[in-house]
Amino acid sequence: LRDQMMLLALNHCKPESKFAIIRAFPTPEILSKLIESFFSHHRVQTDPWLHAPSFEPNRQGPEFLLAIANAGTTFADSKILHSLGFALHERVRLSLPNMFEASNLITRMLWALQTFVLEIEMGLWSGIKRKMEIAESQRQMPFTVRPTISIPYLRLPISPNWF
């Protein structure tokens, strides 16, 4: 998984920067801690929209994992991790159009929509004007894509006693 995530980061960088990115890319342990940090904070929010117990990293796209790791950096007290988070956010933001263009089926996958929403959320709360403006311009798109995604819902029998 780390290799796929690193490849995603390397696809959108200048050739002269690749060696520095490879050396500075987080270890699997750090990525795991960032993902755990995200879920530990996400779970206690008033509106959690990712279900941590059913999250399986091996079944997610590298874009989604990078977006979650990016969100995990916001809870760290390290400027280095914050810088990493901004870089990861930019990689995810740039990779999403390519991902959706590569296969129309990806637009119907829940993890892809969750990646998109998380990328927008991170941009909105980044405090960087450029990132905030880009995220604001994309806020409507997940609502447009949502009807095409198959999301399992709990189906309750309708009983006349409920009315």
Each model region followed by its residue ranges:
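Intrinsically disordered, low-complexity activation-like regions
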Residues: 1-67, 71, 91-96, 116-163
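Elongated alpha-helical scaffolds that mediate protein-protein interactions in large eukaryotic proteins
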Residues: 81-83, 128
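Flexible helix-coil transition and linker loops at the boundaries of alpha-helical arrays
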Residues: 98-107
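Amphipathic alpha-helical protein-interaction segments enriched in hydrophobic
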Residues: 106-117
